[in-house]
């Protein structure tokens, strides 16, 4: 595929409560950036690696049952190639680690805005991240939110895979060390019998 790809912001209602609060301009929204038929988003988890994950564009079911697709907003277009975007997302992952997630200062909407600014030079609409502003005025609000709002189901799957990969690497390293130890231990005089 070539350049000049649309950059789309996919917005999701995060809870049934939005049916009541969105009419007065206060909503709880998740967002992700869609480009090249892929959607990138960010969520929190307790580990020091990237909290950025990928879902099928507009597929709220991959995020979990508390999410409902709301709308797609075309933000502009980008001349970056798909490979470039993967590198950009990987670099952003160094800043947007799972354990760096914060409802007011570094949430999914902050990530979407940062990626959008890089890709097409445009921030996301302010209404999407209004909750962050209000929660900065009412600090205890974050502790009142359900935990699943902070870690969408798609991210939980991504985190599980990352942890599984790390576990397999550790097991391989332990097996190699054990084999080396066994080989070194087969020399006479190396062990003392009790």
Swiss-Prot record:
UniProt-annotated stretches for the region Disordered: 162-194
Catalysed reaction, written as an equation: Thiol-dependent hydrolysis of ester, thioester, amide, peptide and isopeptide bonds formed by the C-terminal Gly of ubiquitin (a 76-residue protein attached to proteins as an intracellular targeting signal); S-hexadecanoyl-L-cysteinyl-[protein] + H2O = L-cysteinyl-[protein] + hexadecanoate + H(+)
Active site residues of this protein: 30, 108
Assigned GO CC terms: cytoplasm
Family named by the database record: Belongs to the DeSI family.
Function: Has deubiquitinating activity towards 'Lys-48'- and 'Lys-63'-linked polyubiquitin chains. Deubiquitinates 'Lys-48'-linked polyubiquitination of RPS7 leading to its stabilization. Exhibits palmitoyl protein thioesterase (S-depalmitoylation) activity towards synthetic substrates 4-methylumbelliferyl-6-S-palmitoyl-beta-D-glucopyranoside and S-depalmitoylation probe 5 (DPP-5).
Name under which the protein is recorded: Deubiquitinase DESI2
């Amino acid at each position: 595929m070539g350049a000049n790809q649309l950059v789309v912001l996919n917005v999701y209602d995060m809870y049934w409560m939005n049916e009541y609060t969105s009419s007065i301009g206060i909503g709880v929204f998740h967002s992700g950036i869609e480009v090249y038929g892929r959607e990138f988003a960010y969520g929190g988890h307790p580990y020091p690696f990237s909290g950025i994950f990928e879902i099928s564009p507009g597929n709220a079911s991959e995020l979990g049952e508390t999410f409902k697709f709301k709308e797609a907003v075309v933000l502009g277009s980008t001349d970056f190639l798909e490979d470039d975007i993967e590198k950009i997302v990987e670099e952003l992952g160094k800043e947007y680690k799972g354990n760096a997630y914060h409802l007011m200062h570094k949430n999914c909407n902050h990530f979407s805005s940062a990626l959008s600014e890089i890709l097409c030079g445009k921030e996301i609409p302010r209404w999407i991240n209004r909750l962050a502003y209000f929660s900065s005025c009412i600090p205890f609000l974050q502790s009142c939110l359900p935990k699943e709002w902070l870690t969408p189901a798609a991210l939980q799957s991504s985190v599980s895979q990352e942890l599984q990969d790390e576990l397999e690497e550790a097991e391989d390293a332990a097996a190699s060390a054990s084999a080396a130890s066994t080989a070194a231990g087969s020399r006479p005089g190396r062990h003392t019998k009790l």
